[in-house]
Design a protein with these regions (language model features):
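Short, solvent-exposed loop/turn segments at secondary-structure junctions
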Residues: 10-12, 50-52, 122-124, 153-154
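Conserved beta-strand segments of alpha/beta enzyme cores
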Residues: 43, 73, 144-146
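Short, catalytically relevant binding-site loops at active-site mouths
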Residues: 50-53, 81-83
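Extended, non-globular alpha-helical segments
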Residues: 64-67, 73-77, 149
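Active-site neighborhoods of divalent-metal-dependent phosphate/nucleic-acid chemistry enzymes
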Residues: 71-132, 154
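Residues at the C-termini of beta-strands that transition into short coil/loop
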Residues: 48, 78, 151
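Short, well-structured N-terminal submotif of metal-dependent ribonuclease cores
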Residues: 1-46, 55-64, 90-96, 130-133, ...
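Acidic, PIN/NYN-like endoribonuclease modules and their adjacent C-terminal/linker elements
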Residues: 17-21, 25-28, 109-161
Length: 161
């Protein structure tokens, strides 16, 4: 069974109060659907980084996020994360201001998981940067990580089959 690393944006969207913003509402629906329809098809893991991020902010929202993460195994910290982060940042694949996002990529890659699930398309699932991120990970001897959004697992809404 393949392993999926759950990044913070997934639990944030899946547990948030329904948004009146249509784009955000779609992301919330996709995150909830992935957790209810797809989660059981994979070994799901997360990291201390995600738990720390999920614990921040509004106490009630944090409680909901942490409850969703409660039964998900947490990866052991890897001392090589900072080395991979530095490569992602120094090659301008992820900006310095988004080092935490680079840490999610590094953590998932070093753990050897098959998928990193995120809705952060600015810094993590950025289509223009992903080929270069994958090339770097391959150069570092960390091939095989695929970074996807829930929509890519769920399929399109216009599928008739």
């Amino acid at each position: 069974m393949d392993t999926v690393y759950i990044e913070t944006s997934i639990v944030s969207h899946a547990t948030a109060w329904p948004s009146s913003n249509p784009a955000t509402a779609v992301l919330q629906d996709q995150a909830k659907r992935w957790m209810s329809e797809q989660r059981s098809k994979f070994n799901v893991v997360t990291s201390r980084l995600v738990l720390d991020e999920a614990a921040k902010g509004d106490p009630d929202a944090a409680k909901r996020r942490l409850a969703m993460l409660a039964d998900i195994p947490v990866l052991e910290p890897n001392p090589d994360v900072e080395t991979v982060v530095e490569q992602l940042v120094s090659r301008s694949l992820i900006p310095e201001t988004a080092r935490l996002d680079a840490s999610h990529v590094a953590t998932a890659a070093l753990a050897g998981v098959q998928f990193l699930l995120t809705q952060n398309c600015r810094h993590i699932a950025n289509a223009t940067m992903l080929p270069r991120v994958y090339r770097l990970l391959d150069e570092l001897g960390l091939p095989g990580l695929l970074i996807y959004t829930p929509a890519e697992f769920l399929g399109g809404t216009d599928d008739n089959d």
